[in-house]
């Protein structure tokens, strides 16, 4: 049995402030650090350990992974960081309050920007200081590959080649893999793994810091998927994520 574990980063400062974050590099809150430690304890309790982990270029995911590995005494394992696991780029929405944006443009429009399959927010201007090509962490990435906004469809196109060429072969070889990333980058992977439709993906909400386990047979057929933790508590957290723009 092969196990893939997905963890959305712990609560970030902009999660707490209910701001669109995207590729903005914000830190974890104290609560986010606690969520990461709790995720590690849940994995230990289940007896799930790793030799390889993957994360994004953004510190909220990197620090969540570091805490998990430290608590599990797995600081020595191989860690691969890639910009391809970054959050969906929210374009000109980055830094705006979700409720205030909903009040201005309507909840339906904001829901489309947040959760729909192929609707992207307004793009950043190329000259905007927030544009990824102005950030030195992306200096080795071709400029034409760096987004100024993204839909979930765009995010999937960015992530899935890396899944197929890099992550999936490691999972096949090692049987367990950990990915610590972001709500929409993980939704992209989940849509692929579960064959979720473009319409149904709108309703998938991932709470911060909760391990989501996928089990596969030796032929990489999906056998089961489940969250670790209290079912009712996780359901309430998912509902809270869904209501962020209300």
Curated annotation (Swiss-Prot):
It comes from the Bacteria. GO terms for molecular function: phosphoglycerate mutase activity. The gene is gpmA. SUPFAM superfamilies: Phosphoglycerate mutase-like. InterPro entries: His_Pase_superF_clade-1, His_PPase_superfam, PG/BPGM_mutase_AS, Phosphogly_mut1. The record marks 182 as: Transition state stabilizer. Pfam families: His_Phos_1. Coiled coil: none annotated. Pathway: Carbohydrate degradation; glycolysis; pyruvate from D-glyceraldehyde 3-phosphate: step 3/5. Homodimer. Transmembrane segments: none annotated. The keyword Isomerase applies. Keywords: Gluconeogenesis, Glycolysis, Isomerase. SMART domains: PGAM (SM00855). Its EC number is 5.4.2.11. One of its GO terms (biological process) is glycolytic process. Belongs to the phosphoglycerate mutase family. BPG-dependent PGAM subfamily. Substrate binds at residues 8-15, 21-22, 60, 87-90, 98, 114-115, 183-184. PANTHER family: PHOSPHOGLYCERATE MUTASE. This is 2,3-bisphosphoglycerate-dependent phosphoglycerate mutase. PROSITE patterns: PG_MUTASE (PS00175). It catalyses: (2R)-2-phosphoglycerate = (2R)-3-phosphoglycerate. Catalyzes the interconversion of 2-phosphoglycerate and 3-phosphoglycerate. The active site is at 9 (tele-phosphohistidine intermediate), 87 (proton donor/acceptor). The keyword Isomerase applies.
């Amino acid at each position: 049995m092969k196990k893939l574990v997905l963890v959305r980063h712990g609560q970030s400062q902009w999660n707490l402030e209910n701001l669109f974050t995207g590729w903005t590099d914000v830190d974890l809150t104290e609560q986010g650090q606690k969520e990461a430690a709790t995720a590690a304890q849940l994995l230990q309790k289940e007896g799930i350990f790793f030799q390889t982990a993957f994360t994004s270029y953004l510190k909220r995911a990197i620090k969540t992974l570091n805490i998990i590995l430290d608590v599990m005494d797995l600081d020595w394992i191989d860690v691969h960081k890639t910009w391809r696991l970054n959050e969906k780029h929210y374009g000109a929405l980055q830094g705006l309050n979700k409720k205030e944006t909903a009040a201005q443009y309507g909840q339906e429009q904001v829901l489309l920007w947040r959760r729909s399959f192929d609707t992207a927010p307004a793009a950043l201007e190329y000259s905007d200081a927030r544009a990824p090509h102005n950030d030195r962490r992306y200096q080795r990435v071709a400029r034409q590959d760096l987004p100024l906004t993204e839909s979930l469809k765009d995010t999937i196109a960015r992530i899935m080649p890396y899944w197929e060429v890099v992550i999936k072969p490691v999972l096949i070889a090692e049987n367990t893999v950990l990915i610590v990333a972001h709500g929409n980058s993980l939704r992209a992977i989940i849509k692929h793994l579960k064959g979720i439709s473009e319409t149904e993906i709108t309703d998938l909400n991932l709470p911060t810091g909760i391990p989501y386990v996928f089990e596969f047979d030796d032929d990489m057929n999906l056998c089961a998927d489940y969250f670790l933790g209290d079912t009712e508590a996780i359901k309430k957290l998912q509902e809270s994520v869904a209501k962020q723009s209300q």
